[in-house]
């Protein structure tokens, strides 16, 4: 099954997440199909907190991809901001 989920990057105690489309059997930070955005939970000042290509999310969901719980809330937030 294909899922849209977060992969962790950044440094120790400074997380930065990529929002990716990946096979659910692959490891969290392993192989992915497509990168569709990022999420920076520690963004301060003018730094961008969330960037997400909502059109690509809709396209993948139409193909049968499932959203993780956290990504579902981020998609809702991105739609509200747009």
Swiss-Prot record:
Record organism: Haemophilus ducreyi (strain 35000HP / ATCC 700724)
UniProt key word Ribosomal protein: yes
Pfam families, per database record: Ribosomal_S16 (PF00886)
Keyword Ribonucleoprotein in annotation: yes
InterPro entries in UniProt: Ribosomal_bS16, Ribosomal_bS16_CS, Ribosomal_bS16_dom_sf
A single BP term in Gene Ontology: translation
HAMAP family on file: Ribosomal_bS16 (MF_00385)
Swiss-Prot/TrEMBL keywords: Ribonucleoprotein, Ribosomal protein
GO MF, one example: structural constituent of ribosome
Cited PANTHER family: 30S RIBOSOMAL PROTEIN S16, SMALL RIBOSOMAL SUBUNIT PROTEIN BS16M
Any one GO cellular component localisation term in the record: cytoplasm
Family: Belongs to the bacterial ribosomal protein bS16 family.
Protein name (record): Small ribosomal subunit protein bS16
């Amino acid at each position: 099954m294909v899922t849209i989920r977060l992969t962790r990057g950044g440094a120790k105690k400074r997380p930065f997440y990529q929002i990716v489309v990946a096979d659910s059997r692959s490891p969290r930070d392993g192989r992915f199909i497509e990168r569709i955005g990022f999420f920076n939970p520690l963004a301060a000042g003018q730094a961008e907190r969330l960037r997400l290509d909502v059109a690509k999310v809709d396209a993948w969901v139409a193909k049968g991809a499932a959203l993780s719980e956290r990504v579902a809330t981020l998609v809702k937030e991105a739609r509200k901001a747009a």
